[in-house]
Amino acid sequence: DNAEIEKILLEEHEKETHHRRGLRDKRQQSQEKNVIVKVSKKQIEELSKNAKSSSKKSVSSRSEPFNLKSSDPIYSNQYGKFFEITPKKNPQLQDLDIFVNYVEIKEGSLWLPHYNSRAIVIVTVNEGKGDFELVGQRNENQQGLREEDDEEEEQREEETKNQVQSYKAKLTPGDVFVIPAGHPVAVRASSNLNLLGFGINAENNQRNFLAGEEDNVISQIQKQVKDLTFPGSAQEVDRLLENQKQSYFANAQPQQRETRSQEIKEHLYSILGAF
C-alpha cells in the first residue's frame, strides 16, 4: 500500500543522506591530514625564484628606504664629511627632482664657501651648534616694492642691486634655513654639527666652491678676468688660494698670528664681495 511505499522511500533517502555525509567526512579528514606537508629544499629554492621574478619586485624596490651613509662620502677630510644621493643614483628621487644630503662638521671646523647653480636647499639642524653666513644682494627682499619715480631713483636702485650683503645666523638643533640658488654660504661648527638637506631643482645642479684647493671655481678664472674682477692683482688672489690647503672642510680655529688672519679675512671678504 501507500504507507509501505513511503516507508521504503524514506529509508532509501536516509541511506543516501548517510552515505553522502560519510563521503564528506572522509574528504575533510583527508584535507586536515594534508594541512602540514613536508617540502624539500629544492622545492623551497624553486618557490624563492618564482617570488623574486614577480612583477611586484620593481614596484617594491622603488619604495624601499635608503641610507645616506651607506656609500662613501662625496667630500671628506679630518674636519667633516658630506654624503649625498641624487636622482641619478636613486630612481625614487627622479620624479620629485630633488636630492638629499647629510653633512657632518667637526667642532671648530668650517664648511667652506660654496653655492648651488640651480638647486634651492632646505636645511635642518639635527644635532650640534654653529652659525652660517650667506651672501646675497642687498635689500633683495624689497626689490620691486618701490615705485620708480625718476631716473635718479632708478639709478640708485640699480646701484643697490649690484651691492651684496652678508646674512648671519646662529644654528641650534631643530632650526631650519633655506639656501637660495646662486647664493654663497659657509657654515661653522661650534660643536659637532649634523645637517640634513633637501635640494629642489636637483637636475643638472652644480655645487661650486669659492675656497679650498680642489673644485675651486675662482682658481679656474683667467688671469685677465681676475685683474678686472677682484681688488688687487690676480697674483694676490692666486696667493690666497694657494695658502688654502684644505678642500671642502677646513679648520676654523685661529692658529696663526692675528695680522696674518686679518689679511686672509680681508681678502676673503673681497672675493665674496665680487659676486
From Swiss-Prot:
Q: Where is the composition biased (Basic and acidic residues)?
A: 1-17
Q: Where is the signal peptide?
A: none
Q: Which GO terms describe its cellular component?
A: aleurone grain; vacuole
Report domain Cupin type-1 positions: 66-238
Concerning CDD domains, the annotation shows: cupin_7S_vicilin-like_C
Q: Where is this region: Disordered?
A: 1-71, 134-164
Principal location class: other
Q: Does the keyword Ribosomal protein apply?
A: no
Quote the biased-composition stretches of kind Acidic residues, using this chain's numbering.
147-157
Q: Which GO terms describe its molecular function?
A: nutrient reservoir activity
Biased segments, Low complexity type = 50-63
Q: Where in the cell is it found?
A: Vacuole, Aleurone grain; Vacuole
Keyword annotations: Seed storage protein, Storage protein, Vacuole
UniProt cross-references to InterPro entries, sorted A to Z: Cupin_1, RmlC-like_jellyroll, RmlC_Cupin_sf, Seed_Storage-Functional
Summarize the protein's role: Seed storage protein.
Q: Which family does it belong to?
A: Belongs to the 7S seed storage protein family.
What is this protein's record name? Answer: Provicilin
Question: What organism is the protein native to?
Answer: Pisum sativum
